[in-house]
């Protein structure tokens, strides 16, 4: 774990507004921020909190709260969910999947020393020699095993507020965008945070089409899992549309990659806990 975690911690004070947090996320290209709480010696402690893009969407925007008047300490998750640096990456995947989170803080003797994301796990599982996802290389159409065929959509003329409410209700991080009956793009939590909240745009009157990612980044169903992981990394995205003969047949996310490993390895994890 210690070899893959990010040791640089982006920390904000608890009185930071949601708009300011979104601006920091956009500036640093981050999906989460730690909320400051230190021990007597000035070290980040487990009693600190974390605020994520998902929190901004589900706990603020979808509920109609004003991002400029809401503070991060009102919505942060605290205490932090942690893992020690000597634990294997597979254990991190189980903790994330079981608790439905994308980030884990790494703690050493109650001091927060790093953070690890679901994207870090996926990259490790795919690229490491003999890694668990490599086992799928010999499977026919491996992306079809991982992708989700039930795809939530939204019309491009609908508002960002409606998109946020749908994401919150369905507990998902993206919506495929429909225009004239065609899938033309994707709107994600990241888009909403960086292009709407951080830009101080009104979610109730900003259209999804104005903030969606276009064109839709696609990958053929016959490509490998490693191809998908690398394309996500190159494009700095968490979702890919999977196509079969140029028709979108599924959606693949970073979480789907990690979930497969977590489910397969669950018996070992339960025996060791």
Q: What feature does the model see in each segment?
A:
Residues 12-30, 37, 82-100, 107, ...:
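The conserved cystathionine-beta-synthase
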